[in-house]
């Protein structure tokens, strides 16, 4: 189990803590260790070595991958999951782009494969994100509302009222 690592990148510390707790509970019976790595939670080299899944914020993972002293650790990473990848178009997008570009460059120079997976519940431009991740067509999966266990009904209502109070009453 210590031959490779999985990194799960979540956009907020609260989400990192939640995912760490959920995965720890589900995977502990399999002997898989899950740890949080954020600006508030630091891991020693030995803790990192004995951890199989690291849940991190984009900013912390960006810092780790920039350090040349962490190269051996980074080379053990075989899977990077980026949750909420639609944030590429957000103010934090450049950090995610940097992580993706650095990972792709590392794969090209070391010839050690690392899989990049992007997750989002709201991603209308999934083909563009697939291009950023350099995903082949057969490796790009998009699940529309037809895959939902409970059908999703959408309704659009137009409000033409211009006056604030009346407009709010109509919207509510």
Where are the model-predicted features located?
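Alpha-helical scaffold elements adjacent to nucleotide-binding pockets in ATP/GTP-utilizing enzyme cores
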Residues: 18-26, 60, 76, 95-103, ...
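Flexible beta-alpha connector loops of hexameric P-loop NTPases
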Residues: 13-14, 71, 86-93, 117, ...
């Amino acid at each position: 189990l210590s031959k490779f690592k999985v990194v799960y990148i979540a956009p907020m510390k609260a989400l990192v803590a939640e995912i760490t707790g959920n995965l720890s509970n589900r995977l502990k019976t399999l002997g898989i260790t899950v740890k949080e790595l954020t600006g508030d939670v630091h891991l020693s080299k030995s803790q990192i070595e004995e951890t199989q899944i690291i849940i991190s914020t984009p900013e912390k993972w960006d810092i780790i991958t920039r350090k040349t002293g962490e190269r051996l650790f980074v080379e053990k990473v075989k899977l990077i999951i980026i949750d909420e990848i639609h944030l590429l178009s957000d103010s934090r997008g450049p950090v995610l782009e940097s992580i993706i570009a650095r990972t792709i460059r590392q794969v090209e120079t070391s010839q050690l494969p690392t899989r990049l997976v992007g997750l989002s519940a709201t991603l209308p431009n999934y083909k563009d994100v697939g291009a950023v991740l350099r995903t082949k067509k057969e490796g790009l999966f998009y699940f529309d509302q037809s895959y939902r266990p409970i059908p999703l009904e959408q309704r659009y209502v137009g409000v033409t009222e211009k006056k604030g109070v009346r407009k709010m009453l109509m919207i509510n």
